[in-house]
Amino acid sequence: MYIGEQLGDLSDRKLTWAAQLGVEHVAVNTLKDTGIQNEDGTWNVPPIRALQRRLAEFGITMDVLNLGIEAAYYQRQRFPDLWTGGSGRDRAIDLLVQNIRAAGEATVPCLKYNCNVIGILRTGRTPGRGGATYSHFDVEKWTERSLTPLGPMPAEKLWENAVYVLERVVPVAGQCGVRLAVHPHDPALPREDGLRGVHSILGTVEGMKRWIRAVDSPYSGFNFCQGTVAEMCRDPRTEVLEAIRYFGREQRIFMVHLRNIKGGYLNFEEVYPDNGDVDFYEALRVYREVGYRGMLCPDHVPHSEADPDNERQHSFALGYTKGLIDALSRS
């Protein structure tokens, strides 16, 4: 396993910064200004290869490319009908299949995506170390309780929709040699009633297990967001390690978002990697134990007025992670 970075900025300056920090593998989050995506959403193979060559000039390999299925509120997504079962679902699937084939032709090893209808929810910020602030979620402080225009979206309806999609895209991914890495639901929603009538089928470890069984393939796995998994747990310190062990042994962890929280299920704040409830040294020890060989990427970081673009925060997270990897290698 090794450090990686998620890049939404592909400028020379940003790539130089990443290379100087020892980053040799990245997930590309943006298609903007790359020429990869046409106006109709379909992808072109030559610009993907051109981007791979450009990254290589900085000593960087593209391990993962963003498939473009966002975690935003469904009405703001490019494919609002995909997980909701709307009339545009089949057209969206056809386009995604075409893009998976393009990724395979360009030898992109992995595509990441989200299964989220209601978006990433937070309720504010809390004071943190040295004047930084932490993103916070407390379900008791969430004020919008009305149903979305979708009406009630119980878990089984969402499962039916998800399996419909997976049955059509996962076999294609397997044929093309492209792994599909889904992000768990951030945050977990109340398990009994959901929120605004919407349930989160990837908001529990059991839901994640069901996902990989639904269309069982070595090409269907996770962008394993360790922070999001911690948000599902009542005891993140122990439960996160158990989840790493389970999905790692199943070889369904395709990349890792490495971030830490304080708190847990329905009430948490996103903190620095070294001051949360999950022991990162122990977490990395378990990744090594199960044979994980992919990227460990910083994800959400605290905000600092002294670091408006979060570059120093990411630098700290990368260096901290690299130090832990090196320490483990000598143990």
Where are these regions (language model features)?
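Histidine-acidic metal/acid-base catalytic patches
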Residues: 1-4, 9, 14-22, 53-57, ...
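Short beta-strand and adjacent tight-turn residues that come in two discontinuous sequence segments
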Residues: 28, 113, 297
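Basic, amphipathic N-terminal segments that precede the first structured/catalytic domain
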Residues: 18-35
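Structural motif corresponding to the early beta-alpha repeats
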Residues: 32-163, 174-175
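Short, well-structured secondary-structure segments
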Residues: 25-30, 63-64, 181
